[in-house]
Amino acid sequence: LSPTHWQASTFPMPFRSKITVVHDGIDTQAVAPNPAVSLTLNDNLVLTKQDEVITFVNRNLEPYRGYHVFMRALPEILKCRPGARILIVGADDVSYGARPRPEEHGGTKWKDIFAAEVRPQISEADWGRVYFLGNLPYQHFIPLLQLSTVHVYLTYPFVLSWSLLEAMSAGCAIVASDTQPLHEAVRHNETGKLVNFFNHEALAQQVCNLLDQPEERQRLGASARAFAQQHYDLHGVCLPQQLAWVNALRSSDSVVGEVKPKAPLA
């Protein structure tokens, strides 16, 4: 089994025809839009759907998932959206890529390295609208997605994060990197907006444009949720396909089991 067609395509040709593509699945009933959602930050700031919230989510904040590109887009986003709040989820370790080399990168954590790079371009007041939330418990993670006005997802050619599909299920308006694995889920102008991975200016512009277009955000979010339900729903789509795959293997084993063993050598 492979969860995505892109991952299946990375196997040598003789093996590809033997791979069945079935995603792990997400619970689209549990992760659904909630117009009444609210989230409290720092015990005193309550955010609702009336607020302008930009979300960026990773297990760890690292270049493999485009953290550096997102941070480089922040000065322009904060400048053009004076009321926006930036919610960044992720720890300060690495999950996939290499760790920074202090002698080359000036630090030991990607989170701090790229924050320090852009900090001189951002005023103290604007920096106060940027929130690093670390790793959130799941019961707080879902409201964060439901709260999002625009959700940003960036990645090198690599496996898709569950968080992207959960953002789609939550009805987020998504701006994502135009990298091959994403083409399976984020279709430009249908289920989201795609931008060049390395072009932080284009990312900032697309985010700001989308924040000015509530009807377009609604359309993209509804389309993204419908796509997630159709292709990635755990109970209605993925689990039945997984069980069918297992049953096919069991049937194959039963046939093999009926073959009589050869008589032992004398």
Which stretches of residues belong to each language-model region?
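Aromatic "clamp/platform" in nucleotide-sugar-dependent glycosyltransferases that forms part
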Residues: 156
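Conserved acidic donor-binding segment of nucleotide-sugar-dependent glycosyltransferases
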Residues: 188-189, 193-200, 209-214
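C-terminal alpha-helical cap of glycosyltransferases
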Residues: 234-266
